[in-house]
């Protein structure tokens, strides 16, 4: 009796505290999807606080805002796309691989309705994707596509992360995450963070520059443990998919090998100062020869440096670049892969990550899992067999051409698992016809092409990209691409772009990403009233998202409609209370409308 009381009383108290915290509204839901009625229809919308379990709130990344019908419409084939920022479509998800995949499938099978739901999120890794998979299993998916692996070292609980403990055991990670699903656990997390803090955690988002101080050697014990955690998470993700009876397309991960030099390189700790000095002398001599175009002579000197330390990643990149210049493509590929694998700032899926993925594919042969070696297939279709700047804006994020190529690769495997009822109604069309149709569906305007290259240019103009030896040529390439778009732009281009948006929206009026691009087009070209109109339509479609409300408010303010602008800023803040830009704009309007001498205007 006493034992029962000793057990039940604390449990009762904990349950009472948990209930009390929920009643007063403390904490956040850890579900990926939340129910919401939009225009009288039931939808599931992404929870902007879903990643609070994995990131400090100020650094948390949000999923795409697009709503999904709570009950899948009859005749719809729903595909969940799982992954990180590369699958998300960074730097612009409106032209991401999921968007191209959906467009391509609808071109090939016009009698069917496809819905590719992108549940990929920037900066996450397999520790986050496993809970996402468990949620997707509840929502009537017909297929999953998994493209993940770039963030295993720097994402939550990775070996080089700034968000949490570094590479703890899977048991520890899952226990902590389970505890944070409770309001008590969230309260404990807040108290502990408040008491101890973490000076290593940035106050604001800084991209991959945040991880620059957490460099990892090739055989760092934390790095090795992170690989095993990835293996365990991947096995469980596939197990969840099998349990849901969903066919899964699992892909290896490609990256920029040719034109993205390592971000950081490390020498072994046991290298003597004398040997290091000799290595540095040889490296500089090789560099001088390489710059002068004497590639074979440079290779000979680099080989001497490699005899001292072959694992310095920048050295392998220089060796690979010289081999490529000499048309020794096979050896160049090996060297450039080794450069990536030894990069001390590990933000690209490396050989060991892709081997774990291939192991999982082979292990599940004959099951509901279908493998695709996208990394190899992308190499096969790249100049000299080595992926580079033609397909990637920087280290891992695809250009529009890269996303389209990956979508074509994935579509081949998707087609193998589609029901005969769908495949009987269509099939692959001529490549040029498919490309044109996809670009028309997504409204790939000249204005958007230049806009996204401009975003990429801004990104690589900051750390850690500026420290790359490949930086100057990548900067030049971005500028050249923007100039190339300019060369195709004529006085009639804005009208043509406008019509392209209109036609695409007539076909897909509920496409919020497409309408968002249209709103930006109007705003940037000075057609502010039309920008407001498109923004208001987005707000109606996405009442749960703060960013369209902020956009409408900011354009209203430029039109001098301060009352309406303030209303939209307030709406944005009701949705996302911690929205500093909206708070700042609202305060600016209040100051403008109030003078101590005159009172309220």
Language-model segments: residues:
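Register position in tetratricopeptide repeats
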Residues: 291, 325, 524, 558, ...
